[in-house]
Amino acid sequence: IYGEKDGTLPYSENSYGFVDILNPRACYPSSKRAAETLCAAYKKEYGVDVVIIRPGHVYGPTMTDTDNRASSQFPRDVKAGKNIIMKSAGTQLRSYCYVLDCATAILTVLLNGESGEAYNVSNKNSVVTIREMAEAFAEVGGKKLIFEEATKAESASFNLMQNSSLTSEKIEALGWSAQFDMLSGARRTLNSMF
């Protein structure tokens, strides 16, 4: 929802960046913005009780076999006995949240959130680079992290946003706190996969 921004500060619930609507990837943040606008309109027009939840990058043992995000590929590779192969330096900063923490955050907002408000779901102890996430899965799974050159097609599919970290103060003020940092979330993910 937030789009691209300047600077290194994490996104708060009231900060928005630029979305290039001619970029094919723009459909994702644009559709999320449209959904939130509909929620706000229904609250104002019909008095519908609405809370908005904005999760960061949620990971855990719930990914599908076709999910090609790094947070799904890395644990699948480790579980299959493979080393983790990275096709970039992995310097992009992301707010990761273990799936169980995300579930408790959603319940907290549904029960305690203020109607009409939006809440980021972010674990301040798991704001890490993609490389650091890969290192956590490699460490827990006893595998190596290997870097290879990306093909032109692979490079074209990368999300180049350097910093998509989120603040968590607003949801923490409701009494929520994350229980799993990146290392414990990686361990729990690998231990729960079949």
Summary of predicted features, one role per range:
Residues 1-53, 57, 66:
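Catalytic helix-loop patch of NAD(P)-dependent Rossmann-fold dehydrogenases
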Residues 33, 59-73, 82, 87, ...:
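Glycine/proline-rich active-site loop of Rossmann-fold NAD(P)-dependent oxidoreductases
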Residues 34, 38, 42, 74, ...:
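Hydrophobic alpha-helix immediately C-terminal to the catalytic Tyr-X-X-X-Lys motif of short-chain
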